[in-house]
Amino acid sequence: MNTTVLAKLEHISLTAGQREILHDVSLEVYPQSILTVIGPNGAGKSTLLKILLGLRKPDSGSVWRKPGLSIGYVPQKFHLDRLLPLTVERFIGLSLPRFDRMRISEVAGITGVAHLLQQAFQSLSGGEVQRVLLARALLNQPELLVLDEPGQGVDVNGLGELYKLINQLKQHHGYGVLMVSHDLHLVMAAADQVLCLNRHICCSGQPEAVSRHPEYLRLFGNGYSTMGLGVYAHHHDHKHDIHGSVIPLTKEQSHG
């Protein structure tokens, strides 16, 4: 793995009113490596991505991005007015300052949607939409891809192919990838590093180690089932070392 850091977050914390969104979260993203953030709904995953992208400011902590870093972003939610007549080619081209058919064809070929370029965007399936959004994210030759739930709306058969494509982008083009996903069984197969988040870092490391970690099992149970993803009631009666292991707080620390 290339050890040049593309972007990093250090000790990020954020609250909204009385609700703690993130507490003391740190991470680093490297070229040619996939870091996947997993966790239950409401764990702060999408917020964490927005902070790294500069779309939201934390209350404390620091954000660093490599100078001149080019980022391709696929958001969790995307809506296009179904009454707007737009081909896939035109939709991808909206991200360019000047329409460049050759570049559009190139990224469409990389993501497997070249045959869809003249189709209406509104006619696409969920899996096709995600591949088109990924093609658009590649237009400006990014060093880092930030993908928020790229498997959303994709059927079971298409999920494996989508994650295979993301892995190929990492291997063949050297992209760093920071991804949020709920598809635990596929994440564990595709990611180089996994960070389990529930407003704080529960555990992190290589997928196999994370899948055996007590905090991961506490959230998700045995295996990679996505059932029962409710947020556990978290009281700061512990903290974690750099490997995600639980360190009990002293009585003074837990009330401080």
What does each of the following model-derived ranges do?
Residues A120-L124, E128:
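Conserved ABC ATPase signature
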Residues R212, L219-G256:
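ABC ATPase nucleotide-binding domains
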Residues R101-L116:
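Conserved ABC ATPase "signature" region
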Residues V194-Q206:
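H-loop (His-switch) and adjacent beta-strand-loop-beta switch element
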Residues S181-H182:
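H-loop/switch region of ABC-family ATPase nucleotide-binding domains
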Residues Q141:
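Conserved catalytic motifs of ABC-family nucleotide-binding domains
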Residues L145-E149:
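Catalytic Walker B motif of ABC-type/P-loop ATPase nucleotide-binding domains
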